[in-house]
Amino acid sequence: MEPFRIHKGTAAVLMNDNIDTDQIIPKQYLKRIERTGFGKFLFDEWRYDNERHENPNFPLNAPDRKGASILITGNNFGCGSSREHAPWALADYGFRVIIAGGFADIFYMNCMKNGMLPIVMDKEMREKLVKTDAREQIEVDLENEVITTSTHRFHFTIEKMWKEKLLNGLDEISITMQYEQEIKEYERRIAAY
């Protein structure tokens, strides 16, 4: 997993509350186990019409929001069924940071396990971020827990364990591999059956 220290990018805005994992990535696209290729199906039923043409009224389809790597959204983002495909779709689309009023617990953890930074921020601060020019680069500094625009500076908090994992690009496998020698020692000491 790539370390996350400072990220600069533009923001897309989808301020709906209670966006669930079925809306993030519909069930018909969950037959694959690779982590890539899901970005084109992100928010599929909102982004496209029945003929698979882009819906011009959907915020992510706005020309000045394409290529955004920060998503600013409402409360309870990622609720619903637990599926890791939802963070895979967001990451594959290009998002590195999701700023919401709150997240479903499992979704929140799955974001960090996949190298994305979910930030909980109150509505007033999110509304200030939403007013940022669509072309402006927003800086997210994980180490100092600060978001900076040309006109505002916001502080956020993140649990120390998750912060360290993201800063160092560690997932469960890489953490386990840090103990490879101890695991081998343990296996040598244990009798085979």
From Swiss-Prot:
Primary role: Catalyzes the isomerization between 2-isopropylmalate and 3-isopropylmalate, via the formation of 2-isopropylmaleate.
Pathway(s) this gene product operates in, as recorded in its UniProt entry: Amino-acid biosynthesis; L-leucine biosynthesis; L-leucine from 3-methyl-2-oxobutanoate: step 2/4
Lineage: Bacteria, Bacillati, Bacillota, Bacilli, Bacillales
Protein name: 3-isopropylmalate dehydratase small subunit
Cellular component, GO, one term: 3-isopropylmalate dehydratase complex
EC number of this enzyme: 4.2.1.33
Name of the gene this protein is made from: leuD
One MF term in the entry's GO annotations: 3-isopropylmalate dehydratase activity
Stated family: Belongs to the LeuD family. LeuD type 1 subfamily.
Subunit description: Heterodimer of LeuC and LeuD.
Top-level division of the source organism's lineage: Bacteria
InterPro entries with a match to the protein in the record: 3-IsopropMal_deHydase_ssu (IPR004431), Aconitase/3IPM_dehydase_swvl (IPR015928), AconitaseA/IPMdHydase_ssu_swvl (IPR000573), IPMI_Swivel (IPR033940), LeuD (IPR050075)
Keywords assigned by UniProt, alphabetized: Amino-acid biosynthesis, Branched-chain amino acid biosynthesis, Leucine biosynthesis, Lyase
Catalytic activity: (2R,3S)-3-isopropylmalate = (2S)-2-isopropylmalate
Enzyme class: lyase
